[in-house]
Amino acid sequence: MTEYTEIHRPQFHFTSKRKWINDPNGLVYFNGVWHLFFQHNIEANTWGPMWWGHAVSSDLLHWEQKDHALHPDKMGSMFSGSAVVDHNNTSGLGENAIILFYTAANRDDSQASYTQCMAYSLDNGVSWEKYANNPVVRTMAVSYTHLT
């Protein structure tokens, strides 16, 4: 059913071609294609710097893995988020933009910071552009685990 032939690889549950994946994010349907995004450590089979992988399917069973949609940057790794199709160009980014909302997690400094960011595609998910004015929501001064 899929392109995978390894004996222990799931055939009805998406898995990446290589390395470690975390939770799926932002399943969205657009122009007859399902777009699945997932947290992906491209360096190892364990937890590490998170990218957002991207796979597409017409039937939710047969998946084709695409180039990564998001990669770590100065704001940190790419954590959980969602996707929407902006049919009415409410964002002003362009007609029928696919928009990704994600958490940028900077865990390298002495105080971890988590911000909400956006990225978008104007070519049916082939290429992705991070929003120039990221973050769209900054970390609050008070978190649930400690005061900052």
Q: Language model features by range: what are they?
A:
Residues 1-34:
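N-terminal regions that are enriched for targeting/export leaders
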Residues 4, 38-64:
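Beta-propeller domains
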Residues 4-14, 60-72, 123-139:
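Blade-edge beta-strand/turn elements of extracellular beta-propeller
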Residues 23-25, 79-82, 147:
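Beta-propeller and closely related beta-sheet repeat lectin domains
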Residues 33-36, 93-100:
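Entry beta-strands of beta-propeller and related beta-repeat scaffolds
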Residues 53-54, 60, 64-90:
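Blade-loop segments of beta-propeller domains
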Residues 57, 119-122:
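Conserved Ser/Thr-centered positions that define the repeating blades of beta-propeller domains
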Residues 134, 145-148:
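Conserved small/polar residues in nucleotide/adenosyl-binding loops
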